[in-house]
Amino acid sequence: MKDGFLKAAAFSPALRVADCTYNAQQVLEQLQAAVQRGVKLAVFPEFCLTGYTCGDLFLQRTLQQGALDALEWLLAQTRTLDTVTLVGLPLLVHGKLYNCAAVLCRGQLLGIVPKTYLPNYGEFYEKRQFTPGSTEVQTVTVCGQQVPFGTSLLFRCRQMPSFVLGVELCEDLWSALPPSTFHALAGATVIANLSASDETVGKAEYRRALVANQSARLLCGYLYASAGHGESTTDMVFAGHDLIAEDGSILAETAPFAGDHAETELDCQRMEAERARNTSFEHSAEGYVTVEFDLAPEETVLTRRIDPAPFVPGDPQRRAARCELILKMQADGLAKRLEHAHAKTAVIGISGGLDSCLALLVAVRAMKQLHRPAADVLAVTMPCFGTTKRTRSNAEILCGELGVSFQEIRIANTVRSHFADIGQDETVLDVTFENGQARVRTLELMDLANRTGGLVVGTGDLSELALGWATYNGDHMSMYGVNAGVPKTLVRYLVQYEAEAAATPALHDVLLDILATPVSPELLPAKDGEIAQITEDLVGPYELHDFYLYYVLRCGFGPAKIYRLAKTAFAGRAEYTDAVLYKWLRNFYWRFFAQQFKRSCLPDGPKVGSVTLSPRGDWRMPSDACATLWLAELEQLKPGE
């Protein structure tokens, strides 16, 4: 439960139709095993105490009483179990029979939620036996306990306030306006659905989409426990298709007819953070009754996969589609700006590195979109003290293969003249030595753009902006920054995608060699003709920083939780010890706060993903904010703990 993680499970126990005692025993057996694994929320199917396929037997008082007896037995057996359990049963209230979910915790019946929408079409005839539930909450006596009864019920954990449970049953989700929508607006971060969804061709895919989409719309965790083996097969079969989703992603799922259960951890803190960011998500709890309960606080062992590359889709097909979309977005943004400014050229400083390579590829696409020749892109290479033969050669080959205009400006003499003006010793390889070169390059590009009636296209990426790895008013400045919304880990895949689609073998080969070149600003003199200044040796691995960036900006998590997630995500990577993860996380926070002043005057550039740092859009932060609180939280952690 630490850091907002809740271990939850959806079950489909094998049962016997109308054998309540046996069914309750099956529930308890699975529940006891789940508690040993740390499960704090266990959801069982609709009518799991009786079986869904009892038909008119539901109208028999013997079956109704048998279900109550089974519930009472479960309450007694779960007094010492530290978990919230949901089971389905028929319940007679004031002479009407309801299809209900009972919510149990430590021997207490927290509440009973009746089903709202009763299907009465096709193979379903629930209105024959049952009455729809009402939103009005009333108090009823069940198993000797005074219990709230109604659809407008929420259940909140005192020890983890971000865990607020709402309940609906099967058809409720399939309706036009599911009760879970109102539950979420009233504050529910987790929805449990007790279901008895029979299996037909194509239904599993539709069911999966329903659950995923509802969790996305409601910014919640969603558990769907469906009836399985043991239900009557007189006219239907039930596959036990259990699903657990969070904010649009399926985290755990059982294969139909597998006879298994779905189990994972839900991140309730993340749901709270998403809702805090989304001001369209309006809170409305009118008419709701919230029942509070207690669970013993325990650290949840994470078994869910934490993606070490949250910006990059793991599936090759999805990744390719994502790359094509991003390239089109970048190109369209630049095309609009070129069109609006009546720019004759797009001027780009080319280094032979990844970022300038991507910017050049985007500029060529933009010209193609505008039905203009690639020659309207002016690529400029500006070798100086740190330029190597490899990067210089790659820059020239790339420009030739793309058909852009190419110009070389040797800036060493200009830089030396500038150093003489300001009294900088050329042998002192300090920050002035590095930044002076970067600013001269920007000066050349800006004036060249003026001379050719063009715009300077910025090449810096999102990761560099987060770390402030740019020279203020040097490569930090441009007239339009096409890469400003693209993290470094994704830049690689965009260039690789273009390499795979390259029109010529030479273009393919040069793009692959650029991908294989170490990331470097090449501002310090080369050693034996090789790059001497490796960016990731200085600021840390970009895959770590992109991971940290995602969880800081997208989720608003604190350092302790991000450190924990990183240890899970990069487990098994020998180079990423706890000490290394900690070191670069601390470095990230220090740089992120210290370098905001560069982002406060960022050139225009297109947003391409959910995380961006534009001061006019998604990230508004004062340039002089203090990192004290975040660094203090980190100080309380020790690598290895």
Q: How should these model regions be labeled?
A:
Residues 1-347, 365-374, 401, 406:
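Enzyme catalytic cores with a strong preference for nitrogen-chemistry domains
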Residues 23, 161-163, 219-220, 232, ...:
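ATP/NTP-dependent adenylation/nucleotidyl-transfer catalytic domains that generate, transfer
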